[in-house]
Each structure stands twice: as structure tokens, then as C-alpha cells.
Amino acid sequence: MENITEVTEFILMGFTDNADLEILSFFLFLAIYLFTLMGNLGLITLVIGDSRLHNPMYYFLSVLSSVDACYSTVITPQMVVDFVSEKKVISFIGCATQMFLAVTFGTTECFLLAAMAYDRYVAIHNPLMYVVSMSPRVYVPLIIASYAGGILHAVIHTVATFRLSFCGSNKISHIFCDIPPLLAISCSDTHFNQLLLFYCAGFIEVVTILIVLLSYGFILSVILKTRSTEGKRKVFSTCGSHLMAVSTFHGTVLFMYVRPSDSYALEHDMMVSIFYSIVIPMLNPLIYSLRNKDVKEAIKKVFGKRILCG
């Protein structure tokens, strides 16, 4: 009988083995991570500290910021450490944990963006009744459901992936433990896993994008009925940042997961993963801050107080 040795740890190969490029990447991604934390935690602090931001729209935004901060924390610190490590090793349990958390926060963000689109529709359709229509009885369950959906999706894929055998190469051609590169090195039949990934990710994408499209379809009908130019400008300002965040996030996720497995190109996909898991969490606070009047006013208020105190 042939002895089969199961893998007990994995090696994250990353996107380069050039020593000079690794040092440069270390400082670059460390700066991105610190900027991500500063931006997202700063936005959460603004929402908590400024009474003008105490409404469902900004509660959703603060939850999105917490998800982005956690999502980046699951991936970036490990990658940064690997840039200056001789052995880029992650344990079997560590890999499973990283994948579970990455899928949880990534999926939660999909659901949250859909909930935020619905929230924008409610606010614009009947602004006078917004606080009543989007009361804690409505937005709190939406937030909880987003997390629950993310956790359930992560459990499905983590269990399905780590029940496979890893008895050959333990080198993952990626920056973190993601589903496609793990399936690529498994010595088991991964056909079921590939179908599971395609249909689960596809279902989530279709449902959440449909909610976004319907919400913004209704918003557009409201805009067309609005005669006031100032009213239209305010609506576009409010919704533009959310549409930008939705487009960038869903575009990369669709490209990464909802396509035939034989079209995967791990090196190319790695760059896409960096964008949606590291760059987008950094950009979201900027997108929402620069295009949102209330957030900009809150920032000016904070810095104004510091200047006066100084």
C-alpha cells in the first residue's frame, strides 16, 4: 500500500521572490494597512462622536468600515510578515482560519452593500419618514443577517475545502489562503468544490446585485420626478459614493469567483485579490468621505477643534 503524507502546513508563495521587491512591498503594504485602519477606524469614530451622523445610513457605513478593517487585518499582516520571512509558512489550522474569516468578511460586505442600497432608496423615496421606516427594528436585523450570511457561506466553503486531501505540494500560489489556489493543489477530486464555489458565489452575487439594481432603479425614478436641481444634486451626491463602492467590489468578485474553473490564472488572479481584499478596504473611507457632505463637515469639525485646542 502506498504511503500518503498529508500536508500539515502551507507555504504562501506570494507574488514575488525578488528580495529587493519584497522589501519595497513590505513598506508599501504596511503603509496601505496602516492607512486602511486609520481611515476605517476614523470613520467609525466620526459616526459615534458626531450627533449629525446618528442615523441608519451612517450606522451602515460604520459597520462597513468595521468589516473592511477586519477583512484587511485577516490578510495584510500575514502578507507583510511573509515579505521579510525566509519561510512563508502558515499552519493547516491557520490557513483554514484565514480562509474562513476572509470569506466571512468578503461575503458580509456583499450583503451590507445591498442593504445600504435599500437604505438609500428608503431615504430618498420618503425622506420625512426615513427614520421611522428604517428604525432599529429594520436596520439591526439587516446588519445581523449580513453577518449571518457571511458566516454561513464561510462555513460551507471551509468545511468543503478542508475535507479534501492535500498530499502533494503545499505551496499556495497566492498571498493568502483563498479557495481557488487551495483547490489547485489538492490531490482530491475538486469538481464538487468548483461547482459549489461557482453556484454559491454566483447566487450571492446575483441576489445582492439585483437588490442594488432594483433600489437604484427606484431611486432613478424618484430623481426623474424631482424638479429641483439642488434636490437632484443632493441625491447624486448621496448615492454616487455607494455606487462607486458597489461597482468596484462586485466587479472584482464576479471576475474572481463566478467563472469556469478552467479559466483561472493564479498569478493574474492574485493581483485581482490584492485589489478587492486590500486596496478596496483602503479606498472605501476615501470614497465615502470625499463625496459625502455630512462626513466632510464632521471631519472639519474635528480638525477645527484640534486647531483651536492647539
From Swiss-Prot:
A Pfam match: 7tm_4
Alphabetized UniProt keyword annotations: Cell membrane, Disulfide bond, G-protein coupled receptor, Glycoprotein, Membrane, Olfaction, Receptor, Sensory transduction, Transducer, Transmembrane, Transmembrane helix
Organism the protein comes from: Mus musculus
PROSITE patterns linked: G_PROTEIN_RECEP_F1_1, G_PROTEIN_RECEP_F1_2
Transmembrane segments: 24-44, 53-73, 98-118, 132-152, 195-215, 236-256, 270-290
Protein name per its UniProtKB record: Olfactory receptor 5T7
Cytoplasmic side: 45-52, 119-131, 216-235, 291-310
Glycan attachment residues as annotated in the record: 3
Family statement drawn from the similarity comment of this UniProt entry: Belongs to the G-protein coupled receptor 1 family.
